[in-house]
Amino acid sequence: MSEMTPREIVSELNRHIIGQDKAKRAVAIALRNRWRRMQLEESLRVEVTPKNILMIGPTGVGKTEIARRLAKLANAPFIKVEATKFTEVGYVGKEVESIIRDLTDVAVKLTHQQAMEKVKFRAEELAEERVLDALLPPPRDAWGQAEQKEENSSTRQVFRKKLREGQLNDKEIEINVAVPQMGVEIMAPPGMEEMTNQLQGLFQNLAGDTKKKRKMKIKDALKALVEEEAAKLVNQEELKEQAIYNVENNGIVFIDEIDKICKRGEVSGPDVSREGGQRDLLPLIEGSTVSTKHGMVRTDHILFIASGAFQVAKPSDLIPELQGRLPIRVELEALSSNDFKRILTEPKASLTEQYVALMKTEQVDVQFTEDGIKQIADAAWQVNETTENIGARRLHTVLERLMDEISFDATEKAGQAFVIDAAYVKARLGELVEDEDLSRFIL
């Protein structure tokens, strides 16, 4: 669990996301409260539930990115789902409980990676010994049994040194490696994904792993053997228990497009996937127990972050019970031309930095001037204002259009330099930005 302070969390988010300080503060406090809760006595810890968050703001302003970066900082199981994919039980569409099943799968994978990393050093030692055994087979006695190998024989040490220095990487050896059986693919009918997953797991367990003698290069053999030895050192049952604990106490669920399941006005007849979908979400958010293939998972302390543009519906159109389960409301502002300019240059691995690096692979030098960046930002903002506002995603469209010619001809123009200044941007995008009809189709 992350021990970062709210100020440190906001500072880290600032490296990737421009603006939206209120939203960053809200998620930073929510994450720190996770750590604070774990410091409490058991009796009080059970009573402290997370304060779920509702993010309100237009598309492309950073709602999803904030949640995604937060999960990375926390090193916590994280899943993003679309609210519109889930319907009432009995209708075509996924059941909401599959959110927790998918989150548990993510947690198992995350915990497995962490466990493998812990035993990696020991696994590398064991893999090295197996490769040395293949290079220097131990002598056999009169009955054909392998004699006790000499761990520190001078020949073995010479080969060990060469192996560690990479001198034997391309040499081929024959080793016994575990070959997983091909899984049985079962097409799942809607709503029965969990059952088909269990059937697939059953078939794989029945088949098991078989050992097969394979000829391979030493560098490839080492990779395969390290994974095999690490898997032997990891206790799978403990790993599942740890993963479930991780989900229950650190899991984060991001529910996007929650405004699309609001009931709009007076609608008669069955309102499939709207109010029914909200009512199905309620037990998950307020706390229930979900059965997964890894075990039972309680959702009482999972943090839920819901988001929506709320351009047609309003937060008050959500059913009252759900509104009460999302007590923290954060409004994200639409991005200005100045925000676009900062997005192009300030974040780590910014868009302009990415394009410069991509062109360098073709020996083409691309430079973005300050007035060029301002012109790109203004163009993106203007198109957003005159057509549909898609936020920062408009920058991708504008930049792709701007760099189209350079990207296409890069192979023939190796060694050349291009300066993207205001004049270049106007020449490439000026007409498209001014003509609203063209903007709608091309930008």
Curated annotation (Swiss-Prot):
GO terms for molecular function: ATP binding; ATP hydrolysis activity; peptidase activity; proteasome-activating activity. One of its GO terms (biological process) is protein unfolding. It comes from the Bacteria. It holds the Pfam family AAA_2. It is found in: Cytoplasm. GO terms for cellular component: HslUV protease complex. ATP binds at residues 18, 60-65, 256, 321, 393. The keyword Transmembrane does not apply. Keywords: ATP-binding, Chaperone, Cytoplasm, Nucleotide-binding. PANTHER family: ATP-DEPENDENT CLP PROTEASE ATP-BINDING SUBUNIT CLPX-LIKE, MITOCHONDRIAL-RELATED (PTHR48102), ATP-DEPENDENT PROTEASE ATPASE SUBUNIT HSLU (PTHR48102:SF3). ATPase subunit of a proteasome-like degradation complex; this subunit has chaperone activity. The binding of ATP and its subsequent hydrolysis by HslU are essential for unfolding of protein substrates subsequently hydrolyzed by HslV. HslU recognizes the N-terminal part of its protein substrates and unfolds these before they are guided to HslV for hydrolysis. A double ring-shaped homohexamer of HslV is capped on each side by a ring-shaped HslU homohexamer. The assembly of the HslU/HslV complex is dependent on binding of ATP. Belongs to the ClpX chaperone family. HslU subfamily. This is ATP-dependent protease ATPase subunit HslU. It comes from Vibrio cholerae serotype O1 (strain M66-2).
